[in-house]
Amino acid sequence: MLSNTIRSNFLKFYANRHHTILPSSPVFPHNDPSILFTNAGMNQFKDIFLNKEKVSYSRATTSQKCIRAGGKHNDLDNVGHTSRHLTFFEMLGNFSFGDYFKAEAIAFAWEVSLSVFNFNPEGIYATVHEKDDEAFALWEAYLPTDRIFRLTDKDNFWSMANTGPCGYCSELLFDRGPSFGNASSPLDDTDGERFLEYWNLVFMEFNRTSEGSLLALPNKHVDTGAGLERLVSLIAGTHTVFEADVLRELIAKTEQLSGKVYHPDDSGAAFRVIADHVRSLSFAIADGLLPGNTERGYVLRKILRRSVNYGRRLGFRNPFLAEIVPSLADAMGEAYPELKNSLSQIQKVLTLEEESFFKTLDRGGNLLQQVLKSSSSSSCISGEDAFKLKDTYGMPIDEISLLAKDYDYSVDMDTFHKLEQEAKERSRKNVVQSQGTSESIYNELHLTSEFIGYDHLSCDTFIEAIISKDHIVSSLQEKQEGAIVLKVSPFYAEKGGQVGDSGEIFCSEGTFIVTHTTSPKAGLIVHHGRISQGSLTVEAAVTAQVNRYRRKRIANNHTACHLLHKALEITLGDHIRQAGSYVDDTKIRLDFTHPQAISPEDLLCIETLVNESIRENEPVDIREALYSDVMNSSEIKQFFGDKYSDVVRVVSAGHSHELCGGTHAEATGDIGFFRITKEHAVAMGIRRIEAVTGEKAEATVHQQSEVLEEIATLLQVPRDQIVSRLTATLDERKQQDKRLNELENSLIQTKLDKLIHNCHQRQGITCLVHHLAEHENHRLQQYAQCLHQRIPEKLISLWTTEKNGKYIVLSRVSDDLITQGVHAQDLLKAVLTPCGGRWGGKDQSAQGSAPALPATEVLNETLWQWISTQLI
């Protein structure tokens, strides 16, 4: 693969120039709610640029997995219809953190363009900011001035946000020649097809204030990004990114599966959509995301449904995406081993989602017919209906428009676009970063805390800051609530699913009860609580003491959580991925990927494996290691989405080996005993196990034993005969229910004999209007079904009953009358509209309700009048 060669040579080039090669971060940022997906190489370095995080390296290079399919950067609707839009792409980049600046960045970029990308220097152009004389002068060493262009803020100024680090940027472009257009320079190339931008160099040299002023940064940074797929297309000389390398391989696989031939014109859009989307979906699932109904999961579901809709154009009527994934793993698995490691999980998730959506599409097709019918008076599909078809059933708006055109219908696009924009705003609102006053205060403190809590549960230290009611204060008085920052702290701050410590901070002047501990930013430990007696002031010498008994229970539960995770993997398979966890002093909660409920036998096996590890009482080994040494180890579990520092902690307990920053038991035997209390689904493809340990586990067993004893007493049998007695009792109940059903059916048939005798006939059609007593309302459907079985042709029935203070109405029409244009839902519309009622259903059967109804005789006359209008 050409992409593998370019990626490898790019990283090697910068590694040979003292850059640290770092792995790609996941496709979603773990601690940055301001963006849905990782959309640039600099995302993982954001805290470094903001001076919130210190690292051991000053130069770095990466190939970053990116997704642009939500929020501000959303290319989803363009994919398949343009030459280069993608939802998934790789961003090659080099970064300098206060090290080199413009001169070196430009020199490196020029050398890479010639020696790694092998571009003809005569085809390279550069743009700079109109005020960046320095960059212009630097480029003059490599390019003639007529190939360097000055542009405005719109094109050549980069900022992270409205305030903060920002700076000029310089873009590199390559002239692909006259076959890509007649533009004579990048300024004339309005669609950017001939002079294709392939690299952006960002020079962070300013700090924008809230007033809009640009102040020089004390440390200047470099952030560059070059799209790998675009580079491959340029080097291979293809017209689009889809005609070379990985994407062409995926298109070829889709050709094989569909039996159709790809063409690079508009007719090939379906192939391009599938090739791109299967990459986004596969990488997202491998990184721990799953399709869902909110936020990132909702975007993944939209991507998958868009893939399926385009797949249907190629003739796919059953799940097919999973069959393409092995080709992707073969092409990119060497660079991204998570694709191969998660292959079965990716395929399972895709297949389950596709199966679900194909069922939804069947309903959607019926809905479209109903929409067309309900819009018959205006010959226009409403914006609300169009949006529902797109948002709920995944039908692209262009497909809705085409289908509407087939029936000479139009679509209210103005309302549709308005609703779509409102939905985008709601989605964006869910993920927009909301910084509370307290968080802003913590950022202003410019403090860090030294954590010593792995080895010490108490220490003498100093108070560095106090916060109360969102203000920095100098002291806290008795009964006041607030937060304290210490210079040195033994308190573990909540993170990684483990709750923060509690305890006390005290001196002779006062005592502060710590209820919980957090870390609002890297390196800062904040102790929350209240003054129980006396007062405490900033700079006071104090003793910090963790509640050691609570800490021990938390540590035991955290180690048990690791053992549980390993037991799940052993019992259920290597597709298991942690999707979330919560550990405190009373319980364990572990969310994980698994497509179905766990059987009682497997739950018992999981519980047994954990307790076996506990009984072995092996020491829990915790060691520090360089992340670069362990990041590719298949034995050591790490969690995609977590951001790891240069040095990590490897926690080994029994057969479990995980990267973890939490606190743990000294030996597995400290856990005592493990008991699962609950297993259930929390989302599609996500299961949750809840468990307890130690004394809590023993108490749970005792409680369950007491319940069994009570049941045995009620059944008047020994405990070992409970199951057999209940089985016999339930069998007896089934027989009684069967006899009761037979009796009720006999009574229904007897009643139907009378009802049939009272049916009215006109024009060869049999009609019945009947009111059921309220005590029979649960048999409304049964009466209607039985009557239509007895009289299968030319029958219309209307049934009413009462329930919870309102009238329920059911209409049913025989199949032969449906073909003549008589429909059950239309009958209810005629009956219930004058009553202020509501209804819904299908042609054969429909049901509705109303606050009041006319007498049965009036309904009977209404029915015949309506029939006469239908059969004219």
Swiss-Prot record:
Cofactor: Zn(2+)
A GO BP entry: alanyl-tRNA aminoacylation
EC numbers on record: 6.1.1.7
Compartment annotation: Cytoplasm
Keywords attached to this entry: Aminoacyl-tRNA synthetase, ATP-binding, Cytoplasm, Ligase, Metal-binding, Nucleotide-binding, Protein biosynthesis, RNA-binding, tRNA-binding, Zinc
GO CC aspect terms: cytosol
Gene Ontology MF term list: alanine-tRNA ligase activity; aminoacyl-tRNA deacylase activity; ATP binding; tRNA binding; zinc ion binding
InterPro entries, A to Z: aa-tRNA-synth_II/BPL/LPL (IPR045864), Ala-tRNA-lgiase_IIc (IPR002318), Ala-tRNA-ligase_IIc_anticod-bd (IPR018162), Ala-tRNA-synth_IIc_core (IPR018165), Ala-tRNA-synth_IIc_N (IPR018164), Ala-tRNA_ligase (IPR050058), Ala_tRNA_ligase_euk/bac (IPR023033), DHHA1_dom (IPR003156)
Main localization, broad class: cytoplasm
Cofactor details (free text): Binds 1 zinc ion per subunit.
Annotated residues for binding of Zn(2+): H558, H562, C660, H664
Reaction(s) catalysed (UniProt annotation): tRNA(Ala) + L-alanine + ATP = L-alanyl-tRNA(Ala) + AMP + diphosphate
Role description: Catalyzes the attachment of alanine to tRNA(Ala) in a two-step reaction: alanine is first activated by ATP to form Ala-AMP and then transferred to the acceptor end of tRNA(Ala). Also edits incorrectly charged Ser-tRNA(Ala) and Gly-tRNA(Ala) via its editing domain.
Record-stated family: Belongs to the class-II aminoacyl-tRNA synthetase family.
Domain notes from UniProt: Consists of three domains; the N-terminal catalytic domain, the editing domain and the C-terminal C-Ala domain. The editing domain removes incorrectly charged amino acids, while the C-Ala domain, along with tRNA(Ala), serves as a bridge to cooperatively bring together the editing and aminoacylation centers thus stimulating deacylation of misacylated tRNAs.
Stated name of the protein: Alanine--tRNA ligase
Organism: Chlamydia pneumoniae (Chlamydophila pneumoniae)
Lineage: Bacteria, Pseudomonadati, Chlamydiota, Chlamydiia, Chlamydiales
